[in-house]
């Protein structure tokens, strides 16, 4: 959204894929179009996000499918926490439940999206042929992790050297954009997180987080990733089933931004 609003000269460099929120919203809405599944009930899609910008994203024309919002409402994690407290809900008194199927299986690559460098790390995993510990460790230690405002790394893909940059914080993004425009640097892939340290420190997260909390949030995502058997999206059986079923012939319509509309 920031690039679309403030640096239109880079608009053509943006990927055509939607954000995870918008992809999932479109898939959910398509899934529940089936009368046997919706059983005559009206679908209301609510997204819980650490990012306040997601509230605007659902209203943007290019984020809609056939002119309709795929996600109806966005609540931040802070708003949801407040609602839980006011409702008197005590998690220690609630029995745990498994996630709903068929959308309850995720990958470690998806989990680490929430920390700076996570998107790039997920891409690097996807480009590998397997997910042995050696391969995962090599990616993890490639320089993609850490809190630095700008990280640069290179990796080999099919005999070609790929240059990537990972930047977090819009101030750092502005500096990098100027360097790219001047010709000082050139990259094949750039990851930008608007918030320092990524989504774990998003504008919708609880405020006042100190260094210990920031580190704990990142560690929580990385620890979850370690314990997940599926490390990348193309190994997720639910994702593969979606492409063979619900998404067949609808990939562009449901997963890509609607570039045929006029942006305000």
What is each stretch, according to the model?
Residues 1-7:
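Short, exposed "boundary/linker" segments that immediately precede the start
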Residues 8-264:
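Iron-sulfur-associated redox domains of electron-transfer enzymes in respiratory
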């Amino acid at each position: 959204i920031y690039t679309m609003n403030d640096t239109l000269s880079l608009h053509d460099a943006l990927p055509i894929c939607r954000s995870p929120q918008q992809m999932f919203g479109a898939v959910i809405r398509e899934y529940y179009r089936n009368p046997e599944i919706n059983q005559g009930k009206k679908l209301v899609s609510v997204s819980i996000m650490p990012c306040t910008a997601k509230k605007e994203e659902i209203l943007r024309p290019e984020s809609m499918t056939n002119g309709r919002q795929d996600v109806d409402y966005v609540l931040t994690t802070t708003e949801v926490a407040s609602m839980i407290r006011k409702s008197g809900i005590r998690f220690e008194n609630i029995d745990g439940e498994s996630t709903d199927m068929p959308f309850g299986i995720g990958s470690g690559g998806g989990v680490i999206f929430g920390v700076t460098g996570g998107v790039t790390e997920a891409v690097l995993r996807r480009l590998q042929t397997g997910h042995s510990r050696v391969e995962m460790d090599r990616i993890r230690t490639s320089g993609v992790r850490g809190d630095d405002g700008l990280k640069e790394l290179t990796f080999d893909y099919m005999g070609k050297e790929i240059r990537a940059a990972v930047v977090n914080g819009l101030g750092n993004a502005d500096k990098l954009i100027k360097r790219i425009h001047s010709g000082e640097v050139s990259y094949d892939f750039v990851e930008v997180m608007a918030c320092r340290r990524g989504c774990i420190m998003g504008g919708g997260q609880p405020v006042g987080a100190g260094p210990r909390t920031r580190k704990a949030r990142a560690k929580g995502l990385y620890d979850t990733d370690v314990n997940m058997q599926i490390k990348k999206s193309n190994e997720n059986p639910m994702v593969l089933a979606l492409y063979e079923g619900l998404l067949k012939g609808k990939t562009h319509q449901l997963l890509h931004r609607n570039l045929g509309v006029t942006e305000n």
